[in-house]
């Protein structure tokens, strides 16, 4: 039976569906009727559009393979995703490790990757920290704090939190000074190899606008810095740093094999390079990230490897096609 590729109509669905069509698959988008024209008229990448949050029976009848986006769990909920009957590209067990900051930290440390210090008690803050609420919300609610007093003032202002009992869904991380770098990887279970797909950095409001205001005016305005993501900027990394990034990806894949039965498909390590050229990672996104949308026509790194335009969305479709051709489809699905 013909396999079709499906995804929720959000985040990086345009790229995923375009890549699937480029590899000869029929495509399915599902979600809000409000966005239907985006996928069928303005950017006609969906052969089918189903106006439901999660149309399980229709997807099963269409022999769909669901490809998760970076906002998949945010829209559908982790319980629904873990229990869906439609074949899912990737390892669902990764979702718990990715969404739980303590498990995520355990994963990164097992991989031998430098991670920021974490404060369990805000009253112990003794250096600049960045405070992150639970869940992937594009940096919304993130804030900097320099000491306990500053933390509590901003926690109430941005998150409505006044008591320690309400802190269970936030993480207080050491703020590591450096250049933000977000390498995008793809691990092929068919080929058993890691690929560096592309690299980006985020464009965030208002932190990336602060520099346009003279320092004396910043002090007068008494502004609080926020980190809401509004877009992404491509990066070509210094060539001497590429092996650091690639080796970090290899170690994450190896640790995932031991902890949760493997990580395959696209993922991203979100971190910074310090002035000492140390790669410090503060988060992992174990699915396609929005930063790959810059590279719908491929990146410098995929061009070097494939000598043709290959986006992360297309690479997913290539993996599914190769799995079908090698009678390995069940091995890349859960």
Curated annotation (Swiss-Prot):
Q: Where does 5-amino-1-(5-phospho-beta-D-ribosyl)imidazole-4-carboxamide bind?
A: 10-11, 71, 75, 232
Cofactor-binding details, from the entry: Binds 1 Mg(2+) or Mn(2+) ion per subunit.
Q: In which pathway does it act?
A: Purine metabolism; IMP biosynthesis via de novo pathway; 5-formamido-1-(5-phospho-D-ribosyl)imidazole-4-carboxamide from 5-amino-1-(5-phospho-D-ribosyl)imidazole-4-carboxamide (formate route): step 1/1
- Disulfide bonding pattern of the chain: none
Instruction: Name a biological process GO annotation.
Output: 'de novo' IMP biosynthetic process
Provide the catalytic activity annotation. Answer: 5-amino-1-(5-phospho-beta-D-ribosyl)imidazole-4-carboxamide + formate + ATP = 5-formamido-1-(5-phospho-D-ribosyl)imidazole-4-carboxamide + ADP + phosphate
Question: Which SUPFAM superfamilies does this UniProt record tie to the protein?
Answer: Glutathione synthetase ATP-binding domain-like, PreATP-grasp domain
**What protein name applies here?**
5-formaminoimidazole-4-carboxamide-1-(beta)-D-ribofuranosyl 5'-monophosphate synthetase
